Design a protein with these regions (language model features):
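Conserved PLP-enzyme active-site core in the AAT-like
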Residues: 1-113, 179-180, 202-208, 220, ...
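Structured alpha-helical segments in the cores of large, soluble enzyme domains
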Residues: 1-3, 17-19, 29, 33, ...
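A short linear-motif detector with a strong N-terminal bias
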Residues: 41-43, 61-65, 112-113, 120-121, ...
Length: 257
């Protein structure tokens, strides 16, 4: 609130946020931003949208995200596909970076086709002022994501979200049973569970490699007062045996001299 004033152009927040928590005040945040004339930009993990509210429902003006969870390999950080969406408002659409493709029909109406739309934004018309200058070609990844989404459908996306919630909540249950301080942060979460250990999170992460486990994220890298807190991520592919292997490894590491 103290940093939000009439000079604020936009406010960006993520849901779930960096600590893996689901923001529960999204409506209030959006309302306060709009009351000051600021745009609301929301970063999302698209795999969550099968079970969480879409940003449009709480007033997001712009939504961004990474398409990697939608059927793409991590590829050590890239290349991947970005997601960029706005409200259906001409003022936003005309300022979007990249090319816009719209669906249409053939002249006789028998076939569906796709073409560039709002071409007054394009380089062959606006030259150096074209907003489509700001783009890269990620068509191959966009195609893979389209196939993934078409294969999954709304029900499939919902089921994946539910499976991730189930896996992460099972992991939380096991952390508690093994007497770890978890969750370290209070609040609802999606697929990431915060855990405090006796050893530093950096040491935990390093030693887990010996057990063929990558994780969790040492939050001490970002926050000085969280040197013993890790963020463990769980997805739809993790099994109960995977989670048990993690518990076994953590107990051995914590008990080692």
């Amino acid at each position: 609130n103290s940093k939000l004033n009439d000079d604020t152009a936009a406010v960006y927040f993520e849901n779930p946020n960096f600590l893996g928590l689901i923001e529960d005040a999204v409506d209030e945040i959006a309302q306060k931003c709009h009351s000051k004339g600021a745009l609301v930009i929301v970063g999302v993990n698209p795999i969550t949208l099968g079970v969480l509210r879409p940003p449009s429902s709480y007033g997001a003006d712009v939504v961004v995200g990474d398409g990697q969870p939608l059927g793409l390999y991590p590829n050590f950080g890239g290349p991947l596909m970005g997601i960029f969406a706005t409200r259906e408002d001409p003022n936003f659409l005309r300022q979007m970076p990249g090319r816009l493709i719209g669906a249409t029909r053939s002249k006789d109406g028998s076939r569906r086709g796709y073409t560039m739309v709002l071409q007054t934004r394009e380089q062959h018309i606006r030259r150096e002022h074209a907003t489509s200058n700001i783009c890269t070609n990620e068509a191959l990844f966009a195609l893979a994501v389209s196939i993934y989404l078409a294969s999954m459908g709304p029900q499939g996306m919902k089921e994946i979200g539910q499976q991730i919630l189930s896996n992460s909540n099972y992991a939380l249950k096991r952390f508690k049973e093994e007497k770890f301080e978890s969750p370290f942060f209070s609040g609802s979460f999606f697929g990431e569970v915060s855990v405090k250990t006796k050893r530093s999170s950096k040491d935990i992460s390093k030693r887990l490699v010996d057990f063929n486990i990558l994780g969790g994220l040492p939050l001490g890298r970002f926050y000085e007062d969280l040197q013993q807190v890790s963020l463990f991520s769980f997805n739809e592919l993790h099994s109960s045996s995977d989670i048990e292997s993690l518990m076994t490894a953590l107990n051995k590491i914590e008990g080692a001299k």
